[in-house]
From Swiss-Prot:
It catalyses: RNA(n) + a ribonucleoside 5'-triphosphate = RNA(n+1) + diphosphate. The RNAP catalytic core consists of 2 alpha, 1 beta, 1 beta' and 1 omega subunit. When a sigma factor is associated with the core the holoenzyme is formed, which can initiate transcription. This is DNA-directed RNA polymerase subunit omega. GO terms for molecular function: DNA binding; DNA-directed RNA polymerase activity. Its EC number is 2.7.7.6. It comes from the Bacteria. Belongs to the RNA polymerase subunit omega family. It comes from Alkaliphilus metalliredigens (strain QYMF). Keywords: DNA-directed RNA polymerase, Nucleotidyltransferase, Transcription, Transferase. GO terms for biological process: DNA-templated transcription. One of its GO terms (cellular component) is DNA-directed RNA polymerase complex. Promotes RNA polymerase assembly. Latches the N- and C-terminal regions of the beta' subunit thereby facilitating its interaction with the beta and alpha subunits.
Length: 68
């Protein structure tokens, strides 16, 4: 089960779509060797990325392409 929960994550991100895209991109960065910005018990990059987003350690920028 994902911690923080989807509902908790949606309080810091404006939509489910943005949440999925931001989490996936950050997880890919972690897989590729990016420094992890939170203490995490999980060795799963998606869980770590979600925790980083929830704690505000990682942000995303909405572009014009996102509005299509």
């Amino acid at each position: 089960m994902l911690k923080p929960s989807i509902n908790e994550l949606l309080t810091v991100v404006d939509s489910r779509y943005s949440l999925v895209v931001a989490t996936a991109k950050r997880a890919r960065q972690i897989i590729d060797g990016a420094k992890i910005k939170v203490d995490s018990d999980s060795n799963k990059p998606v869980s770590t990325a979600a925790k980083e987003i929830y704690e505000g350690k990682v942000t995303y920028i909405k572009t014009d392409e996102d509005e299509r």
